[in-house]
Structures are given as structure tokens and as C-alpha cells.
From Swiss-Prot:
It comes from Chlamydia trachomatis serovar D (strain ATCC VR-885 / DSM 19411 / UW-3/Cx). Belongs to the bacterial ribosomal protein bL19 family. The keyword Ribosomal protein applies. PROSITE patterns: RIBOSOMAL_L19. GO terms for cellular component: cytosolic large ribosomal subunit. One of its GO terms (biological process) is translation. Coiled coil: none annotated. This is Large ribosomal subunit protein bL19. HAMAP family: Ribosomal_bL19.
Length: 121
């Protein structure tokens, strides 16, 4: 029974999305339907946490806009997600970056990985 559930979850998981880690800055494009029209909305932010696994995996992004910190969570295997693009790789020593919540400006920055180490990650 356990193998059957795992097989079903593996079928539902998307493989076309970019590989990213906590601390990376990513750009997520999602389909938004307003009225009778559909458009693509892009949200760019720092990955604070990845939760779950398989078909129910989620990612939480943090972004500072106009001096206010904002968070948004995405279900990675959602059909609403068009694409995920890695903008830059970050260097962090934590699995969850919830300490970014109260920070703005330079305090909310994550060190960037540059060169060959960023390509390996």
C-alpha cells in the first residue's frame, strides 16, 4: 500500500521546475485569473523555507517592497505555477530563515554565492 501511494505522488510531482535551496532568490511566475481573463503574475523573493515533500511540497518566499516585508507561500506542484527561475544563489547556515521577518533594508539581505560554488549548488 505504501508503494502505491509513493508511486502516485511521484506521478503528480513536477520535474520541469528549477532546483533551488533556502537562501536563494527566485522568481515565480503564476497564472492569475481576473474576471474572464488570465495573466501571468511574477513574484520575486528570498526562499525562507521549504516544507513537506512529494506532491504537497511548499515554499515560502520573503520580499521587502516599499519598506514593508511580505511573505508568500506557493505549492510547488500546483498547475497555476508557470515557471520558477533562480535569480541568485544565497549562502546561509540555517534551514529556515524566519529571522528575516522583522528585518528591512540591509538587515534583510542574504550573502550571495559567486563563481563555481554557485554553479555547483
Amino acid at each position: 500500500m505504501g508503494n502505491l501511494i509513493k508511486e502516485l505522488q511521484d506521478e503528480q510531482c513536477r520535474t520541469d521546475l528549477a532546483d533551488f535551496c533556502v537562501g536563494d532568490t527566485i522568481r515565480v511566475a503564476t497564472n492569475i485569473s481576473e474576471g474572464g481573463k488570465e495573466r501571468v503574475q511574477v513574484f520575486q523573493g528570498t526562499v525562507m523555507a521549504r516544507k513537506g515533500g512529494g506532491a504537497g511540497e511548499t515554499v515560502s518566499l520573503h520580499r521587502v517592497a516599499y519598506g514593508e516585508g511580505m511573505e508568500k507561500s506557493f505549492l510547488l506542484n500546483s498547475p497555476k505555477i508557470v515557471s520558477i527561475e533562480v535569480v541568485k544563489r544565497g549562502k546561509v547556515s540555517r534551514a529556515r530563515l524566519f529571522y528575516l521577518r522583522g528585518k528591512t533594508g540591509k538587515a534583510a539581505k542574504v550573502k550571495e554565492l559567486i563563481g563555481s560554488r554557485a554553479a555547483k549548488k
